[in-house]
């Protein structure tokens, strides 16, 4: 029964994260256009920032239970961030001759995601 409950916790978080990613993609396409996958980039950066913060905060705090951590990280962040979409969009750009955009997409997604994990960790240390 415990494993089923944990699966439901992750599933609910995944639903919320994926829904948030969808809303971010709609917002980004409307506001920034469709020439570059800004929605995926924003979702990946936001997810990196939040997972860095949550993981750092949870190491030194009893305020986040193991179930809440599972819900937030594996669930919401797992549904929000998307390596498969990033990969597909990058390959599509490269195979369609948009080499510069493809390379920019790789650099921005990887560079910003790594940077924002560190920023999230530092924010957690500063705030808590």
Swiss-Prot record:
GO terms for biological process: cellular detoxification of fluoride. Keywords: Cell membrane, Ion channel, Ion transport, Membrane, Metal-binding, Sodium, Transmembrane, Transmembrane helix, Transport. One of its GO terms (molecular function) is fluoride channel activity. Its main location: membrane. It is found in: Cell membrane. The chain crosses the membrane at residues 4-24, 39-59, 71-91, 99-119. Na(+) is not transported, but it plays an essential structural role and its presence is essential for fluoride channel function. GO terms for cellular component: plasma membrane. It is a multi-pass membrane protein. Na(+) binds at residues 78, 81. It catalyses: fluoride(in) = fluoride(out). SUPFAM superfamilies: Multiheme cytochromes (SSF48695). Pfam families: CRCB. Belongs to the fluoride channel Fluc/FEX (TC 1.A.43) family. Fluoride-specific ion channel. Important for reducing fluoride concentration in the cell, thus reducing its toxicity. This is Fluoride-specific ion channel FluC. It comes from Clostridium perfringens (strain ATCC 13124 / DSM 756 / JCM 1290 / NCIMB 6125 / NCTC 8237 / Type A).
